[in-house]
């Protein structure tokens, strides 16, 4: 790498205190630091200069940097580890960069956090080694040019200057999902096709015809089949790409009003820093920071179903600092600092600054991500912060892994055997000829070309088209409505599933939550005793206006105490949530990220305390008994996330001027936050055994002084651009999350989905081992497993929980090695221990168990389990789920199934197949999986039989011609045989089925046979090889016997043998059909008629006069009888002696 420019020799040019001189002496250049450079500079500190660079000396709209101790730059590389250690205790300010410089003085640095110093003696040189070169013209006078990139560093945005001066600094916002362009389409597609052995083999065969010594017959005989395959594939790809381009064009040309430019421009032309106005129903064109909303509260709702698959509306709020600013102030007087682009849609760090003095933090609540939709009425004004491939939507769009079905792998193995047969047969025929000339290797090559039909070029096209047929049949099956096939390459794998990994909530259960029980330590209330709770809630308003002792409600001392406790519990439940009431067409609906929260709000409504109004600053509750409202000011909200497993809120009671911190969450985390008690763990277990999802409710009263101290430290932490979440969490823990008053416990019921019990029983009888992987508690998972019939009545459940030591994990396996009929129940902590230390030993045992239930699983553990089962067993694994936490597991499966549920469409969008209910899985596997696998297996073998039989005819003819490699069928005959004369009847096998649909559910054991792969195996393949050898030999030998090999009779022999070949294939298809339908009958008759009609046009190949004689028809009949009758007889006898299971079932079911 070239040496970096010398800063010392040019420091006067770079950092001159006179800004005008600085602007004249330094050409425009950009210094961008990539992620690696940031990491290297994290440990840099300047020993003698606590403030190395500061941003000041503003001249008009231009700002520049002053280097106070410029010589320190030259000393960077000379600092020893000792000097670094001395400076480690010195407070240093982070280097700041500025994006407002003009093009003439655009020198920028990124933030460099203070961290422990590096021990390197030349750390600055190492840091500079990560720099890249971008502007050779402007850096040429400093030595080697340097390129730096702004794409992956923190960015500072000024609406008045960034879109103008930095227009080329950030990526374009033009959307492009097209795979090809006019130049790359043909070469790219040809490469993709010819990397497959099939197509490359036939290309070589076709090209060989350009060599005179290898030329056999007509060039079209070899070019046309390959061209047909490529044309079908290229047409399909072209249509798909044109549709992608059309969708891209529509999105790119959507107009948006840009305030900073005072005109409407297409989405593709938006730049970072543009202020745009978005109206209700508009798609968000880029990642935006919400600055203003037409709602006085600054609130806006967005739909994120196209981003994360969740169907509920998300609340977004405008920055308070900018909500009431004029458009002129928004353009000229604010700046936005945004963190580097990243994938997480739930995380954003930034701040907005007004007049270079007042700042407000920015979080994900202030963002509008690209590809979401503004749902609330009115409009909003937002600033573009990320464009194009830097947006969250683009960064989370990954190219789906191309899945290859097991059947394709098996066919590929068989094709290799066929290829070996071609080589062996070619060498054998030349050997029989005695290698009589010096050009024997040319004869081998000519035989390879003649026998190329053994590897059928049309096999891939037939299978691909068949998959499309299966997908159409699945999507149009009225018994499983709204099913979507997203991956059409693996429908056959639906018939080979041996392991089913399922989520619980929303998959086996309805995800329709109802709060069934609340427990207050000494007493619990259920849905049957809600009237008692309602009575207590009635006293809520009077007890707030007057003291409870003066209340008109006469209560005993015990009931007074209980009234207080119930009141506090219900009031906390009504306040501590993120639910927002919305009105669409005068209908009240609740919007929330979790159905649990909606269930809780509906429960408080049922007992007389309903959510009346909520915005970002306040929440109002309606006391239905008195008609009065209870108003609370929302001071801070701490949303739920999968890491914290809790949510909290700070409110001020406007009537009593009291400050309260309220929190609810999982028992595993809340037990450490609430005051010590002797009942929480026991009651949590009791509720879980009832199948209820539990939440622990607590609260804490704050005095105003403590709250103000918390707010100050929390605000300071929220402005940090380094480890913001960690700093904020530390402040919350310090002031809030300890010694909470334990109010009670809620139990929410999630009912089983329709027909889950019968579906699981069917799948287990079909030989599928079912695992349930859930993030819920052990007791809840156990209860749901029993009710869903995952665990049979009386079946022993071996429980492994809280295993934290490797030796303890190993000892737990001993029992399971002995009792293979037991069910395993394991928690995530123990599972993690096995995955880390005893993966091989653990899965060697548990893959044989009928049922495994894993609780408290993380999304990554779910994915790991799927991957390990696939690796260890080699069996097909199906994963099914409905939530975002199931996506990893679904994508790691051989077959991923997503359920469109109340958690949204994220799992559905990531899956290979999307269904609406778990019970639809039985239809998908037992019926469509069976048909897809058996049909494709038969289709593949028929296509190979079609190629083998014509190759056998060619081999017999070559042997009878004294081992001369002369083509038997040439030109159109070769092309027509594989297309017009046999393709439609053979392909009609994709409509066949060997058993009625209803019987697949009555006898699910039939599915177990499919997993053994008997429909396409080496055994069945060799049966078809022998069949082809017999029929091909009969057709060719008898055709030659009825005519001769003389040139005058050659066309007669070809006429009778080719006709026999075509009719034989049509009859074989008819014999293999189990259930006839109109389409099959039409294809058989139409194909035969087409051949008959085309015969008069084949005078170049046939002796047409001979085809009108009685001898011709007599000979044809004899050939067909000898070719077909023995095969039909053998098949009938075998079926009588060894009837297949489906035949027994079909016969038994037929009245």
Curated annotation (Swiss-Prot):
Active-site feature positions: 503
Highest taxon in the source lineage: Eukaryota
Region (Required for endosome-to-Golgi sorting): 51-104
Record Pfam families: Cation_ATPase, E1-E2_ATPase, PhoLip_ATPase_C, PhoLip_ATPase_N
Keyword terms, alphabetized: ATP-binding, Endosome, Golgi apparatus, Lipid transport, Magnesium, Membrane, Metal-binding, Nucleotide-binding, Phosphoprotein, Protein transport, Translocase, Transmembrane, Transmembrane helix, Transport
UniProt cross-references to Gene3D superfamilies, sorted A to Z: Calcium-transporting ATPase, cytoplasmic domain N, Calcium-transporting ATPase, cytoplasmic transduction domain A, HAD superfamily/HAD-like
EC number: 7.6.2.1
Record-given protein name: Phospholipid-transporting ATPase NEO1
The encoding gene: NEO1
Membrane topology category: Multi-pass membrane protein
Mutagenesis or variant effect for residue 452 to Q: Sensitive to papuamide A (phosphatidylserine-binding cytotoxin). Localization to the Golgi apparatus appears normal
Segments of skewed composition (Polar residues): 12-21
Any one GO molecular function term: phosphatidylserine floppase activity
Stretches of the chain found on the membrane's Cytoplasmic side: 206-209, 389-416, 460-947, 992-1020, 1074-1078, 1131-1151
Described purpose of this protein according to its UniProt entry: Flippase that catalyzes the hydrolysis of ATP coupled to the transport of lysophosphatidylserine, phosphatidylethanolamine, and phosphatidylserine from the lumenal to the cytosolic leaflet of the Golgi apparatus membrane and ensures the maintenance of asymmetric distribution of phospholipids. Does not appear to transport phosphatidylcholine or sphingomyelin. May be involved in recycling from endosomes by driving the formation of SNX3-dependent recycling tubules.
Segments passing through the bilayer: 185-205, 210-230, 368-388, 417-437, 439-459, 948-968, 971-991, 1021-1041, 1053-1073, 1079-1099, 1110-1130
Effect the entry attributes to changing residue 488 to A: Localization to the Golgi apparatus appears normal
Phenotypic consequence of gene deletion: Inviable; simultaneous knockout of ANY1 rescues inviability.
Natural source organism: Saccharomyces cerevisiae (strain ATCC 204508 / S288c)
Phosphoserine modified-residue sites: 102, 551
Catalyses which reaction(s): ATP + H2O + phospholipidSide 1 = ADP + phosphate + phospholipidSide 2; a 1,2-diacyl-sn-glycero-3-phospho-L-serine(out) + ATP + H2O = a 1,2-diacyl-sn-glycero-3-phospho-L-serine(in) + ADP + phosphate + H(+); a 1,2-diacyl-sn-glycero-3-phosphoethanolamine(out) + ATP + H2O = a 1,2-diacyl-sn-glycero-3-phosphoethanolamine(in) + ADP + phosphate + H(+)
Impact after mutating residue 221 to L: Sensitive to duramycin (phosphatidylethanolamine-binding cytotoxin)
NCBIfam families per record: ATPase-Plipid (TIGR01652), ATPase_P-type (TIGR01494)
